[in-house]
A protein has these predicted regions:
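Membrane-water interface at transmembrane helix exits
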Residues: 10-14, 70, 74, 105-113, ...
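Specific aromatic-rich, kink-prone transmembrane helix
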Residues: 144-161
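Transmembrane-helix signature of polytopic, membrane-embedded enzymes
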Residues: 104-128
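Transmembrane signal-anchor helices characteristic of membrane glycosylation enzymes that use polyprenol
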Residues: 1-50
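Short hydrophobic alpha-helices at membrane interfaces in multi-pass membrane enzymes
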Residues: 160-169
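Short hydrophobic/aromatic helix or loop-helix immediately within or flanking a transmembrane segment
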Residues: 49-83
Length: 169
């Protein structure tokens, strides 16, 4: 619920500007109005106009999430003249934040075998840190990476606990 609220507040801060169906010029729209120190809006720009401003060698999987959203958003902009990039990115961020919390809790509870209270407190502590909480609302790749890292810790931890080797799947 908190992740939904934060993303809603971010979108509402410049709603009419962020959802303009501009034909090009998304760099100016987003960089002029999105100000979050240390975080960029390149995901919105990529979904809006397929201009890639991040290093794809370091984030190859991330582009595979964004490209289908670009195609859908491009069609929607042509059809209704409205940019849905901020909503598409918010769905990815909320989904990733929720599962990052879930996998982190499960690592504490099932892999490390902590009590429910301790696992809950440590999960809440982790997500109370600013550089963990802020990525759950900004259009950046950090929370997606946290979800995959916590998922990897959970899967590898459960395999280690059972004494099994990791397989291709």
């Amino acid at each position: 619920l908190m992740f939904i609220l934060f993303n809603g507040l971010l979108i509402a801060s410049h709603y009419h500007t962020y959802t303009m169906g501009a034909h090009g010029g998304f760099w100016s729209i987003f960089t002029k109005h999105f100000r979050m120190s240390g975080y960029d809006n390149w995901s919105w720009i990529t979904i809006s106009g397929m201009r890639i401003h991040f290093v794809t060698n370091r984030h190859p999987l991330y582009l595979t999430f964004l490209y289908p959203l670009y195609l859908l958003n491009h069609w929607l902009i042509e059809t209704v003249g409205y940019n849905f990039a901020v909503y598409f990115m918010a769905v990815i961020i909320i989904f990733s934040a929720f599962y990052a919390v879930l996998f982190t809790y499960r690592v504490f509870r099932e892999v490390m075998e902590m009590k429910q209270k301790d696992a809950t407190l440590l999960t809440l502590l982790l997500f109370s840190f600013g550089h963990v909480l802020i990525p759950s609302m900004v259009p950046d790749h950090f929370i997606v990476s946290l979800m995959f890292l916590s998922m990897t810790l959970y899967i590898a931890g459960m395999k280690m606990k059972k004494g099994r080797l990791l397989t291709a799947w």
